[in-house]
Amino acid sequence: MNLAAMDPTTYDVQLEAKCVKLKQLFADFDTPELETFSSEPAHYRMRAEFRVWHEGEDLYYYMFDKELNSKVRCDQFLPASELINKMMPALVELLKPNTILRHRLFQIDFLSTLSGEILVSLLYHKQLDSEWEQQAKILKQTLSTQFNVNLIGRARKQKIIFDKDFVVESLNVAGKQLQYHQIENSFTQPNGKVSVKMLEWAIDITKNSSGDLLELYCGNGNFSIALAQNFERVLATELAKPSVESAQYNIKVNQVENLQIIRMSAEDFTEAMAKKRSFRRLEGIDLDSYNCNTIFVDPPRAGLDADTVKLVQGYERIVYISCNPNTLIDNLAELSKTHKITRFALFDQFPYTDHMESGVFLEKK
C-alpha cells in the first residue's frame, strides 16, 4: 500500500485519471458514456487489517508501504471508517499495559458498519487459555462503554467469540432499508457508501425487467436481495459456506420471499444447466421452471471461464460487475459478439489505488 498517495486534496484528480484509463482500456468496444460513482475521499473503508509491533512497553499498529519498502506506524488510518479510527487508540491503550492480552499478539482486524457496529479480531502466535479469556472479557466490557463492539480471539485452530462473530449493516438503498449480515473473515464490500451506489445502479438498470434473475457468485446476497424487487423470482449461487449462511440470514431479516440460494460453484451450476451432470444440492429445485431472462455476475479477479461465458451468452440481459477490467475485457471479446453494451460504469471502491471496479449492462443484439 502506498500511504503517501492517500491525500484527499488529490482525490478528484486521481479519480479523473482512472476514468481516462478505463475509457482507454475499453476503446475497442462500442460503450456508452461512462457513469462515474465517486467515493468519500477519507474514511471510506469499513474494514482494515493491521500488524502489531512490540517495542519495549510500546505497542502500535503498522502497515507495510510497498513504495518505501518498509513498515509504517499507523496510529490513525485515513481510509478506514471514523469508527475504526476512534477504536484504534482506545483499544491499543488498553492492550499496552495488559501483559496477557498483548503477549504474542501479531495482528488486529476491524470490521465496522455505517450503522455503528464494530467487530475487533485479535490474532495470536500462541494458544489462548482461560486466563486470556478472562482478560478478553474485561476488555470487551470496557470497550462496550464507548462502542457497540464484539471481540474475537484467534490462534492456530482456535476462535473464541465475545459475543458475536458478525456485524449487521443497515443500508438505505433507493429509499429502502436493507440489512446485511457480515461475518468476520469473509468477503464483504469494503466501501459501504460506494456499495450503496452499486446496488442503486443495478436496481436502476434492471427496473423494467421481466421474468426471473439468475445470479452467479452471490456472496452474502448483497445484490440478489436488493434486486429481488425487480423480478418475479431470483435464483443465486455461491460456493463459500459462511457466505451462504449469511445470505440465508439476510433473506430472512429482509423478508425476501422470491429468492433461492444454492451452495455450488458457478462452474458446477453451468454443468447442471447444460444437463452434463446432476447434483444432489439441486434436488427439489426445478431449474426448468425458472424463466431467467437476466443474469448477474460478479466474478473473482480471474473473470468468467469459457463455459460460463457461453452460459451467460444465452440470456437476454447481462449485468457484469468486475473487480478486474482486464478479465472483463477478455470476457467482452466473446460477449460483445452476441450482446451490446448499453450501460457502463466506474465505481471507485478503492481510492488512491490503481484498482478499478466497473460495471456493464449488456443486451442481446
From Swiss-Prot:
Q: Which residues cross the membrane?
A: none
Indicate whether Acetylation appears among the record's keywords. no
CDD domains in the record:
AdoMet_MTases
Q: Please list the residues that make up the active site.
A: C323 (nucleophile), E357 (proton acceptor)
- State the SUPFAM superfamilies in the record: S-adenosyl-L-methionine-dependent methyltransferases
Instruction: Cite the EC number.
Output: 2.1.1.-, 2.1.1.35
Q: Name one GO cellular component term.
A: cytosol
Which catalytic reaction applies to this protein? uridine(54) in tRNA + S-adenosyl-L-methionine = 5-methyluridine(54) in tRNA + S-adenosyl-L-homocysteine + H(+); uridine(341) in tmRNA + S-adenosyl-L-methionine = 5-methyluridine(341) in tmRNA + S-adenosyl-L-homocysteine + H(+)
Q: Could you tell me one molecular function GO term of this UniProt entry? A: tRNA binding
UniProt KW S-adenosyl-L-methionine keyword: yes
Q: Which HAMAP family match?
A: RNA_methyltr_TrmA
Give the family, as the similarity comment puts it.
Answer: Belongs to the class I-like SAM-binding methyltransferase superfamily. RNA M5U methyltransferase family. TrmA subfamily.
Protein function: Dual-specificity methyltransferase that catalyzes the formation of 5-methyluridine at position 54 (m5U54) in all tRNAs, and that of position 341 (m5U341) in tmRNA (transfer-mRNA).
UniProt protein name? tRNA/tmRNA (uracil-C(5))-methyltransferase
Organism (species): Shewanella pealeana (strain ATCC 700345 / ANG-SQ1)
